[in-house]
Swiss-Prot record:
Its main location: membrane. The keyword Protein transport applies. It is found in: Cell outer membrane. GO terms for biological process: lipoprotein localization to outer membrane; protein transport. Gene3D superfamilies: Lipoprotein localisation LolA/LolB/LppX. It comes from the Bacteria. It is a lipid-anchor. One of its GO terms (cellular component) is cell outer membrane. This is Outer-membrane lipoprotein LolB.
């Protein structure tokens, strides 16, 4: 694998991009649904049948050490294969990640390609961002992934997820859903681990 250089162009992204993350959306209702309910089981079955989908929107990674704002495009074209694209406000590609079983390809803004068998490791080495990609691909659709500790809202949709990974606890907060899609899909969520926060706002979804 080629030596990996730290990505620096993200530092140039303006703070104003965070405004894209605060657009008006329908917030979640209060209350807690049961994870044993037929409504939740039916919803998870619908989500698990989404083998192909794509979404785009705003991405923010905030920590004491760095602040990154970008646009993202996520394309899932198989249960175990996906493509993640991060672009700057001018639309230029900063990073492309293509993930499939036992193979991850990362392409930087100069078109150089790097390979690994671990997507979380290669994106951390390249950007110094700790992103739980293995579970994020489930969380982004509203599934708990490997987490066993989660709560539902009154509509039997995920409200919070708590997941431990390598001694660290990630908390996922679902702030709103797009109910115009079938099944309903998240359009705002936040991941928190220590001083790290990852914010995602999905502008739209395309499903098959």
């Amino acid at each position: 694998m080629k030596p990996i250089q730290k990505l620096s162009l993200f530092r140039l992204l303006p703070l104003s991009c965070v405004l894209l993350l605060t657009a008006c959306t329908l917030t979640q209702p209060g209350g807690t649904g049961s994870a044993d309910s037929p409504q939740w089981r039916a919803h998870t079955q619908q989500l698990q049948q989404l083998n192909q989908y794509q979404t785009r929107g705003s991405f923010a990674y905030l920590s004491n050490e760095k602040k990154v704002y970008a646009r993202f495009f996520w394309q899932q074209y198989h249960p175990e294969r996906y493509r993640l694209l991060l672009t700057n406000p001018l639309g230029s590609t900063e990073l492309e990640l293509i993930v499939q079983p036992n193979m991850t390809q990362l392409t930087d803004s100069q078109g150089k390609k790097y390979f690994s068998d671990n997507p979380e490791e290669i994106i951390y080495q390249f950007t110094n961002m700790d992103i739980p990609l293995d579970n994020l691909r489930h969380w982004i659709t509203g599934l708990p992934g490997d987490a066993k500790n989660f709560k539902l809202d009154a509509n039997y949709l995920l409200k919070t997820v708590n997941y431990q990974q390598n001694g660290a606890t990630w908390q996922v907060n679902y702030q709103s859903y797009d109910t115009s899609t079938t099944p309903a899909l998240p359009n705002r969520l936040e991941l928190i681990q220590g001083d790290r926060r990852i914010k995602l706002k999905m502008d739209n979804w395309t499903t098959k």
